[in-house]
C-alpha cells in the first residue's frame, strides 16, 4: 500500500461497494453487529447475509450493506442459510474480556456454541471468528476445547493475534482470530506502511473543533481521571495524540464516563469526548456509512465492530483460497497438539 494516498482516499477506495463485481460466494455473518466484518467481505466482492439480535445494529447493517440482516436472537439448531461458502462472526466477547470480568464459558452471553453448531450443520469451506485477546490467556483452556471440537468436525484450525494498525487502521487494536478451514489457509500479509496511519490522519479536520452537541469533561471527571492515571502510573495523560495511532476503541471507553474514556485535548485546554463520526473513522468506517440509533447505541456498535479495513484484508485471503483451492489438503499442525479431551458445551 502506498502512503501517497491520504487515509480518507485509501479508506473510500478500499471500501467502495460495487454491485457489478459481486461473486457468487456467500458469507454468513453471525452476531454481525453493525456489519464491520461483512463490510470488508462485501467490498471484496462477496454476498453477505447477517444475523444480529440488536435492532439498531441490524438496521445499520441493512441500510449500508443493502444485504439482509435478520434481527433475531440466535439459537442452536436454528435454520439460517443454505450452503454458505464462509461463516464469519464475532460471538459476544464479554465472557472473555477484562471489562466483562472474563467469566468465559460460565457466562450466559457466550455465543460460541451457536457458532460451532452452525459450522457443524452447514460445513462451510472456511469459518472465522474474532474475539478479544483475553480468550488466549485466562480462558485458554476453553479455546483449546473449541479447537478440539473444530478438529473433530474435520477442520484444520489456525489462530493468530492480529493488530489492526498493520492493516491500515489508525488504531492499535489487537484481537484474536480463529480460522477453521478444510484444505488450505494463508493469513493476509500486513500492509507495507512506511508510517502507519495516525489518529490525526483520520480526524484532523474535526479534532481541534467544537462540534454541535460537543460533550466536555467536567472538573469532577478530570479529577477522577487524574487519580486513575496517577494510580496506574501513566507516563502522560491518555488523551488521543494525533501523531500516532489511537489506542483501542471499546464500548466502554467510547460511551461510558469512565477513567479510560477516549478524549481530545483542545487548544484552549478543555477536553471533549469523541463524536460518533470521529469514532467511526478511527474504526475505519467510511463517512458514507450511516449508523442507526441513539448516540450510546452507535458508540456500542462501533466499539464492538471488526474494523472494515482489516476485515477486507481477511476477505481477500479467503477469496484467494476459495478460488485457488488446492487439489489436496496442505500439511497440518494443530495449534494445541496436546489438547485437553474435554466435552464442548
From Swiss-Prot:
InterPro entries in the record: C5-Methyltransferase, C5_DNA_meth_AS, C5_MeTfrase, SAM-dependent_MTases_sf
UniProt keywords, alphabetically: DNA-binding, Methyltransferase, Restriction system, S-adenosyl-L-methionine, Transferase
GO biological process per UniProt: DNA restriction-modification system; methylation; negative regulation of gene expression via chromosomal CpG island methylation
Superkingdom: Bacteria
Keyword Nuclease part of the UniProt annotation: no
Gene3D superfamilies in the record: DNA Methylase, subunit A, domain 2, Vaccinia Virus protein VP39
Reactions catalysed according to its record: a 2'-deoxycytidine in DNA + S-adenosyl-L-methionine = a 5-methyl-2'-deoxycytidine in DNA + S-adenosyl-L-homocysteine + H(+)
Enzyme Commission number, as recorded: 2.1.1.37
PANTHER family (alphabetical): CYTOSINE-SPECIFIC METHYLTRANSFERASE, DNA (CYTOSINE-5)-METHYLTRANSFERASE 1
The name this protein goes by in its record: Type II methyltransferase M.AplI
Natural source organism: Arthrospira platensis (strain NIES-39 / UTEX 3086 / IAM M-135) (Spirulina platensis)
Gene: aplIM
Amino acid at each position: 500500500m502506498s502512503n501517497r494516498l491520504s487515509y480518507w482516499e485509501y479508506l473510500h477506495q478500499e471500501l467502495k461497494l460495487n454491485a457489478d463485481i459481486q461473486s457468487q460466494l456467500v458469507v454468513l455473518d453471525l452476531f454481525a453487529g453493525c456489519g464491520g466484518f461483512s463490510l470488508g467481505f462485501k467490498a471484496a466482492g462477496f454476498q453477505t447475509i447477517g444475523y444480529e439480535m440488536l435492532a439498531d445494529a441490524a438496521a445499520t447493517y441493512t441500510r449500508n450493506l443493502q444485504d439482509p440482516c435478520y434481527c433475531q436472537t440466535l439459537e442452536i439448531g436454528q435454520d439460517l442459510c443454505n450452503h454458505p461458502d464462509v461463516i464469519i462472526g464475532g460471538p459476544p466477547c464479554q465472557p472473555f474480556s477484562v471489562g466483562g470480568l472474563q467469566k468465559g464459558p460460565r457466562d450466559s452471553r457466550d455465543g460460541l456454541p451457536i457458532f460451532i453448531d452452525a459450522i457443524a450443520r452447514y460445513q462451510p469451506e472456511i469459518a472465522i471468528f474474532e474475539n478479544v485477546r483475553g480468550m488466549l490467556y485466562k480462558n485458554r483452556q476453553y479455546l483449546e476445547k473449541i479447537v478440539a471440537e473444530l478438529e473433530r468436525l474435520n477442520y484444520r484450525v489456525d489462530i493468530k493475534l492480529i493488530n489492526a494498525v498493520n492493516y491500515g487502521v489508525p488504531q492499535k487494536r489487537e484481537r484474536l482470530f480463529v480460522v477453521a478451514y478444510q484444505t488450505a489457509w494463508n493469513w493476509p500479509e500486513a500492509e507495507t506502511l512506511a508510517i502507519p496511519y495516525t489518529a490525526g490522519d483520520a480526524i484532523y479536520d474535526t479534532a481541534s473543533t467544537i462540534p454541535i452537541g460537543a460533550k466536555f469533561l467536567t472538573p469532577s471527571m478530570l479529577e477522577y481521571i487524574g487519580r486513575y492515571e496517577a494510580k496506574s502510573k501513566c507516563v502522560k495523560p491518555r488523551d488521543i495524540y494525533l501523531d500516532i495511532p489511537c489506542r483501542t476503541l471499546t464500548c466502554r471507553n467510547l460511551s461510558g464516563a469512565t477513567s479510560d474514556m477516549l478524549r481530545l485535548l483542545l487548544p484552549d485546554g478543555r477536553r471533549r469526548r469523541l463524536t460518533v463520526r470521529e469514532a467511526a473513522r478511527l474504526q475505519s468506517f467510511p463517512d458514507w456509512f450511516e449508523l442507526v440509533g441513539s448516540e450510546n447505541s452507535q458508540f456500542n456498535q462501533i466499539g464492538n465492530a471488526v474494523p472494515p479495513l482489516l476485515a477486507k484484508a481477511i476477505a481477500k485471503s479467503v477469496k484467494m483460497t476459495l478460488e485457488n483451492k488446492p487439489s489436496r489438503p496442505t500439511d497440518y499442525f494443530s495449534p494445541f497438539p496436546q489438547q485437553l479431551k474435554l466435552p464442548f458445551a
